[in-house]
Amino acid sequence: LSIFVASRATTEDAFDQSELQENGRIAMRLLTQDLKWAGFWGDYTGSPMAVGQGVTLSAGSSVLAANDCLDNLGRGSLPPSVGTNRGIWVAGVDNSRAITGGAFACIPVASRIANTDVISIKRLIGLPLADAAATGNRFYLATTTQAAQMFKGGETVPAMTPERQLWEYQHFIYYLSPNAAGNPELRKRYLTANGGSVLISGPMAEGIERMTVLFGVDDSPVPDGEIDRYVATANVTEQEWSEGRVVAARIFILVRSLQASSSYVNNNVYQVGSTSVSGNGDGFRRLLLESSVSLRNPAVMAGGGA
């Protein structure tokens, strides 16, 4: 009997470890890939990503506030008329599940997990498109090095110049949410032209218990793109965001097994970025993962002004 119990415990441990690694790998790959491309606007590099400063919007390029995901400054998915378009912005969910500055009301309070981060990423997707492809339920950006024109799928494609490129424009939001069974999951919202910000059906990865980002900040009087310090999300100032001084991200995710084990007691303490998470003696196995990403596009495109 003792041999059987030991064998079962070993099998259970191996299964949990495999599950943790696979869920963690999927989550980290999704996050790092999108973070690498945050603030990517194709060949448009001449001016800030803001309406009236190189960017124009078509008549159909609008999203109702009720269908959008607004940040702490009230800016939504599309380029604003005041201030610049944040290619990346991260907000914290506090212990009462409130989000920094009242941001992202698109995420119901019941669908939030306390003491985690919400990651907002705006960027262009994939490779330049043929004009005939710009017909879907999406927003598109026609770009040159000096100008960018946004339009809705099905509208007339901006003529601009023969050298212009055509891209799909997206706004992704990653956050953690409990499922019906109470297990934590990584969820993702994306932008549509007809419905605004829409939640992708089903989790992107299961068992993601915590997600925290530390940011590398360039403090040089004249920004040189070098990291001078890492700070928690809450300690990045509005000026540092808008001036492109946030040049790197360190992503921490804590993955938890989907079921507790009767043969395991977790008394470990995990340092998830700036937050310590205790196993509290429960039966869930956990795995802490970390990865770093350079944020070159926001630094290049920073135009100043909040």
Task: Report residues per predicted region.
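Aliphatic-rich helix starts adjacent to a transmembrane/signal segment
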Residues: 1-40
